[in-house]
């Protein structure tokens, strides 16, 4: 491998303010160390470093269907008929978006209409 002459090396070292030839042999000095400190993970489902399988880290497995806190429907007890089910069925009417249409009556003075 070609290298600069001694005069050029000293001139280059003086201009840069440091010894550049000493750095050539240790050119990989900025590489990280072989032994790394253990990572500092936040506490959560994945904070364990071992025995941490993917299926236990998966957030989709932690989701559950919504739980019913309150319902407006009454659950029937087995063996008993519904209380006042006939009354409730007669009170309900069909929901219409407008008032009911008036029935047209034919005029009695013009029977052909």
UniProtKB/Swiss-Prot annotation:
> What protein am I looking at?
NADH dehydrogenase [ubiquinone] 1 alpha subcomplex subunit 7
The biological processes this protein is annotated with in GO are:
mitochondrial electron transport, NADH to ubiquinone
Q: Which residues carry this modification: N6-acetyllysine?
A: 40
Q: Which residues carry this modification: Phosphothreonine?
A: 96
Compartments annotated for it: namely: Mitochondrion inner membrane
| Stored Pfam families | CI-B14_5a
User: What's its job?
Assistant: Accessory subunit of the mitochondrial membrane respiratory chain NADH dehydrogenase (Complex I), that is believed not to be involved in catalysis. Complex I functions in the transfer of electrons from NADH to the respiratory chain. The immediate electron acceptor for the enzyme is believed to be ubiquinone.
Claim: Transport is one of the keywords in the record: yes
Keywords, comma-separated and alphabetical: Acetylation, Electron transport, Membrane, Mitochondrion, Mitochondrion inner membrane, Phosphoprotein, Respiratory chain, Transport
Q: Which organism is it from?
A: Pongo pygmaeus
